[in-house]
Amino acid sequence: MKNKYYPLRSSMDELSTKNDNEIDLEKGPLPEYNSEDGNTLPPYSENINLKDPKQMGQNITKLFNWNKSTTPPDYDENRLPITDEGNNPPNTHRENHSSGTADNSSPFLIKLIISFTPIFVLNVPAVCYLTYKDALFKDYGKDEWVYFGVWCAICLMSFISLWCFYETWTKAVKVTVIFLAQCVKVTVIFLAQCVKVTAIFSAQCIKVTVISLAKCVKVIAVGLYNSKKDLVVTIWLAWVVICFILFGCVKDGRLNLNKALICSTSSISAALFFILLLVCIPIWTLKHMLFGLFQVLGVQSCVVIVTKGLMYLFDKHIDATGYEIEASSLFVIGNFLFFYEMERPGALKRMPKFIRNGIASFLGGIANAFGGIANAIRGANDNNDIPLGEMEVESEV
């Protein structure tokens, strides 16, 4: 369906165009008036004589010939809806103010309350403080009453100023509050965006770091496995798990072991892991590593038992410094013995024999020293046993 637009022009519009007369849409066109003819009424006499507004509206409608039948045939009614309630024309009523401007002034009571509110808020803390100190209107002298009067005068002048310039300062406060609210809003949005960006960046950094570490561990594990290091990584992981279990049991109180011993054993695993990262260890078999670890633990246990026995024998207790010294000693001894055993297999097995030979050599040296002292004493005694006659003969010769 083609929509054609026809201008809404009535016969009255054409008449006004011809006569160059302006028509008041509210009152309608001016009918012809003939003063000589008594039958002709003056303009708008019908509306003046009618007291009912509805009848006036009907007369105006008749003057305009307002009816839907005047609509062009091809005009779409949806474009300009026309109400037909009592054949009334569209509402063309315009509000007219007698003064011409809207009254924006606030009521007197509201101005009074709002102007007094700042003074009240300013004085409430002072009154509360003086009441708390029990100094409100108590033991006031001349100076105190003068100060009180000056303060009341200041408050009164402030109240009068606020009341007189109510419109100005309320607008200023309103603008300031809106500005501060916008600043807070912008700041909150900016901080939220910063937090969001920081969180996303941190998450990406953590993700990249975890992926990189996983790749490094994978590369190291594959490299160690391909380099025929028999179960080295597996042994280290198992050893770390054992150390964590021991630490957890000691901390929980379900296992009573020497903390220094546990520290030393865990230090071995840490040193082993460091060397594994460098990939500079020889080919250690599972049997060799287990024997080395257990032998080191045995030596450390012997050291701990001897230390505890001596402390118990002399009725001494090890304080925190003593435990630190013991842990440091076991750390050095444990790592030295472990790596010495790894580099020289069987060194710990030969150690008792070496210690025994050393002790035997030391005791043999002591025995030889005592033998030399005995021989010297014996030689001195032999010189004292020479006969007196032989000594005289020798003197004569």
Curated annotation (Swiss-Prot):
GO cellular component: ascus epiplasm; cytoplasm; endoplasmic reticulum membrane; vacuolar membrane
Region ranges (Disordered): 1-41, 65-102
InterPro entries, per the entry: WTF
Binding partners and assembly: Homomer. Forms protein aggregates. The two isoforms can interact with each other and with themselves. High sequence similarity is required for their interaction.
Family membership noted in the UniProt record: Belongs to the WTF family.
Organism: Schizosaccharomyces kambucha
Protein name: Meiotic driver wtf28
Pfam families reported for this sequence: WTF
Biased composition (Basic and acidic residues): 11-29
Biological process per Gene Ontology, one example term: meiotic drive
Transmembrane segments: 108-128, 145-165, 175-195, 205-225, 230-250, 266-286, 290-310, 320-340, 357-377
UniProt KW Cytoplasm keyword: yes
UniProt function note: Promotes unequal transmission of alleles from the parental zygote to progeny spores by acting as poison/antidote system where the poison and antidote proteins are produced from the same locus; the poison component is trans-acting and targets all spores within an ascus whereas the antidote component is spore-specific, leading to poisoning of all progeny that do not inherit the allele.
Keyword Cytoplasm: yes
Keywords: Cytoplasm, Endoplasmic reticulum, Membrane, Toxin, Transmembrane, Transmembrane helix, Vacuole
